[in-house]
């Protein structure tokens, strides 16, 4: 018989840097989950040179016996764009002030990374979505 799901918690945590402090502790504490077990498992799964400094979304499923499973997603598109362009944040006035440029090759690479988590089925639609996000951040697509 399957375990009964009591809650599903969605968080965005830096890769390899989950700690019992907020936001992890405040989200999992009321559910009765062992926070340190989650932090150790998450940090073990997300630690690595390729994910260093990225924010990784995670969906934690909590069961009635206080056990849990979690699924990590791909980093948000704005985080990948900021990493590709090497900027700290997007433009406060995106259509007036541009903060950087991104190439079509970089857009395609980001779209390939995000394709499993996006609600589109082909690479062209994913690239259009990434280009739109870049434009709304004040990044020129060249």
From Swiss-Prot:
GO terms for cellular component: cytosolic large ribosomal subunit. One of its GO terms (biological process) is translation. It comes from the Bacteria. Pfam families: Ribosomal_L11, Ribosomal_L11_N. One or more lysine residues are methylated. Forms part of the ribosomal stalk which helps the ribosome interact with GTP-bound translation factors. CDD domains: Ribosomal_L11. The keyword Ribosomal protein applies. Coiled coil: none annotated. This is Large ribosomal subunit protein uL11.
């Amino acid at each position: 018989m399957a375990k009964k799901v009591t809650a599903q918690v969605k968080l965005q945590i830096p890769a390899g840097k989950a700690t019992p402090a907020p936001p992890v502790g405040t989200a999992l504490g009321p559910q009765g989950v062992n926070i340190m077990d989650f932090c150790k498992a998450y940090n073990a799964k997300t630690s690595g040179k390729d994910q260093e400094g990225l924010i990784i979304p995670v969906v934690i499923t909590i069961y009635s016996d206080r056990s849990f499973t979690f699924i990590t997603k791909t980093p948000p598109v704005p985080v990948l764009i900021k990493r590709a362009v090497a900027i700290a944040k997007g433009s406060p006035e995106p259509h007036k002030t541009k903060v950087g440029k991104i190439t079509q090759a970089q857009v395609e690479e980001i779209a390939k990374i995000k394709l499993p988590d996006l609600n589109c089925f082909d690479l062209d639609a994913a690239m259009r979505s990434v280009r739109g996000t870049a434009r709304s951040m004040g990044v020129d697509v060249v």
